[in-house]
């Protein structure tokens, strides 16, 4: 039995009658699965059957940092997962640790957190487990993958470390350098240096109290950093803050802080330079950047594209390239026109590399 979300218990007190308009449960056709990593975590995956019938490889979607799988499946009008399913692809979302995850609890009856996980565990444990699970359940020898933000960076680490089982992949708003200027570049290394790597960064609680701000205050911090209101509505961002945000591990933030200071993302033991390893990647990868993305500026995303061995393609989402408005960070997966301007580009790439 799944435990009730603390969020669903406190939202009514915070938002009164408006809670019902924010929280949209998963639809009945969503199948919830769990896959156990070698180091003992149970990851949550959600499956949507292809409609009307499968016409291509299964697709696995992965969220960004301090997020969960609902980022790729927020509601009926903003769901990359349901969109791909409606276009003939059996589609899965995965929530990386600790989002929707349990450690050491068979059956998921009692969550127990395991401290100290970082980027390496996402690359070596979580993504291989999710890919293997989807391949096993579907019987597909290869699957396609799309990752937003951190979900794309983890994909880079997976492919650079020799990860197998992917036919084609897309990364959306995924920086491979964090030393090129950005709103948190100076702050995160200072904060991360003060905190214990076994702690968790509490993103979920503060996001609840930011919900009214996102709807009432123009040019608020989330608007300035995370999205362009010409693409993504305040209501959509309020929903994201209500049930799409999760705490994250400080060890992960410390590795990313090192990336901000040195320009290189390395494994904790220093043996792997993840960006340098991209030169040996042969899986086709589409790299998508948002023209107005302040979390993952265009040069930072372009660094990943340049490092890839290929085959590869680059796509910039902005007015100068035919979009109605310049895309911010979350717009790529939650924007009002993402289903007509962004996701078809990803699907077309997958289809061209499945022949």
State each model region's role.
Residues 50-100, 105-108:
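Short, surface-exposed "cap/lid" segments of acyl-processing enzymes
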Residues 281, 287-289, 293:
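Short beta-strand/loop motif that positions the catalytic acidic residue
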Residues 114-136:
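Alpha/beta-hydrolase active-site loop
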Residues 7-17:
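Bacterial N-terminal signal peptides
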Residues 136-141, 146, 150-264:
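Alpha/beta-hydrolase-fold enzymes
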Residues 21-50:
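N-terminal cap/lid segment of alpha/beta-hydrolase-fold proteins
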Residues 313-355:
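Catalytic active-site module of serine/aspartate enzymes centered on a nucleophile-bearing elbow/loop
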Residues 283, 297-307:
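Short alpha-helix in the alpha/beta-hydrolase fold that links the catalytic acid
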């Amino acid at each position: 039995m799944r435990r009730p979300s603390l969020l669903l218990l406190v939202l009514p007190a915070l938002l009164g009658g408006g809670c019902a308009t924010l929280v949209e449960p998963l639809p009945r056709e969503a199948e919830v699965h769990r896959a156990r990593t070698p180091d003992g975590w149970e990851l949550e995956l959600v499956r949507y059957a292809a409609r009307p019938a499968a016409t291509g490889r299964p697709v696995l979607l992965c969220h960004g940092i301090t997020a969960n799988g609902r980022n790729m499946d927020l509601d009926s009008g903003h769901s990359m997962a349901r969109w791909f399913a409606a276009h003939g692809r059996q589609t899965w979302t995965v929530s990386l640790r600790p989002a929707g995850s349990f450690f050491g609890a068979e059956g998921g009856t009692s969550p127990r957190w395991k401290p100290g996980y970082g980027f390496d565990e996402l690359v070596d444990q979580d993504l291989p487990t999710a890919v293997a699970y989807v391949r096993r359940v579907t019987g597909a020898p290869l699957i396609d993958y799309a990752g937003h933000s951190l979900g794309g960076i983890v994909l880079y680490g997976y492919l650079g470390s020799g990860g197998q089982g992917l036919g084609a992949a897309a990364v959306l708003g995924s920086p491979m350098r964090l030393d090129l200027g950005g709103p948190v570049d100076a702050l995160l290394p200072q904060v991360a240096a003060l905190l214990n790597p076994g702690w968790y960064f509490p993103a979920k609680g503060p996001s609840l109290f930011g919900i009214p701000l996102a709807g009432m205050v123009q040019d608020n911090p989330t608007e300035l950093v995370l999205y362009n209101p010409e693409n993504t509505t305040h209501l959509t961002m309020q929903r994201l803050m209500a049930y799409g945000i999760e705490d994250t591990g400080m060890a992960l933030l410390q590795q990313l802080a090192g990336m901000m200071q040195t320009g290189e993302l390395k494994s904790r033991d220093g043996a792997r330079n993840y960006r340098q390893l991209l030169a040996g990647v042969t899986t086709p990868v589409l790299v998508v950047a948002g023209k107005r993305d302040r979390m993952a500026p265009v040069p930072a995303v372009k660094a990943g594209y340049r490092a890839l061995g290929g085959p590869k393609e680059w796509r910039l989402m902005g007015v100068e390239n035919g979009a109605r408005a310049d895309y911010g960070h979350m717009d790529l997966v939650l924007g009002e026109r993402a289903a007509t301007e962004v996701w078809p580009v990803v699907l077309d790439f997958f289809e061209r590399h499945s022949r």
